[in-house]
């Protein structure tokens, strides 16, 4: 289970690369395109915010908040919108929007710079080791 969570957290492209053992790039690209089309159409079918998330976001209203996901930015925004959460965030950064994906600290640094926040004044909340590793960078 932990291996599955780690693979999924690395993003769609890495997931497809690990599943499709064929080194043929067109095959991988076709599988990725088909998966993205399906995934995009069913983003929120089985996804719900963790209990207490909405109340917590409401309580943190005056603070700047961001989402950093290894998911493509367009899909991240679409999912947040479908879940009614987009309104809580000042910025959403996807795995295709920074020079590196989590666990790289690059997306965290980009968000802090964009929002004008010094690293020692920021808090990271995540649901995987990748989030913690990115925050420590």
Residue ranges of model-derived segments:
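N-terminal helical cap/lid subdomain that shapes the substrate entry/recognition surface
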Residues: 1-54, 61, 72
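Short glycine- and Lys/Arg-enriched binding-loop motifs that mark or flank ligand-binding interfaces
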Residues: 5-7, 65, 122
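Small/polar loops that bind or transfer phosphate-bearing groups
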Residues: 8, 67-68, 126-127
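Short, electropositive, low-hydrophobicity segments enriched in small/polar residues
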Residues: 13-15, 56, 99, 130
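A structural micro-motif
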Residues: 26, 63, 87-90
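Substrate-recognition "cap/lid" segment bordering the active-site pocket of phosphatases
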Residues: 44-48, 72-137
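Surface-exposed amphipathic alpha-helices with a cationic face
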Residues: 54-61, 132-136
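Substrate-recognition element of Asp-dependent hydrolases with the DxDx(T/V) motif
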Residues: 56-81
């Amino acid at each position: 289970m932990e291996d599955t969570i780690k693979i999924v957290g690395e993003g769609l492209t890495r997931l497809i690369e690990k599943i499709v053992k064929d080194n043929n790039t067109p095959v991988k690209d076709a599988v990725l395109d088909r998966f993205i089309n399906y995934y995009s159409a069913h983003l929120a079918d089985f996804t719900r915010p963790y209990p207490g998330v909405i109340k917590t976001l409401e309580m943190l209203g005056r603070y700047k908040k961001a989402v950093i996901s290894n998911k493509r930015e367009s899909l991240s925004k679409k999912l947040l919108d479908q879940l009614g959460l987009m309104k809580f965030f000042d910025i959403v950064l996807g795995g295709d929007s920074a020079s590196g994906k989590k666990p790289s600290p690059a997306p965290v640094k980009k968000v802090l710079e964009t929002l004008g926040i010094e690293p020692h004044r920021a808090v990271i909340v995540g649901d995987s080791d990748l989030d913690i590793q990115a925050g420590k960078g």
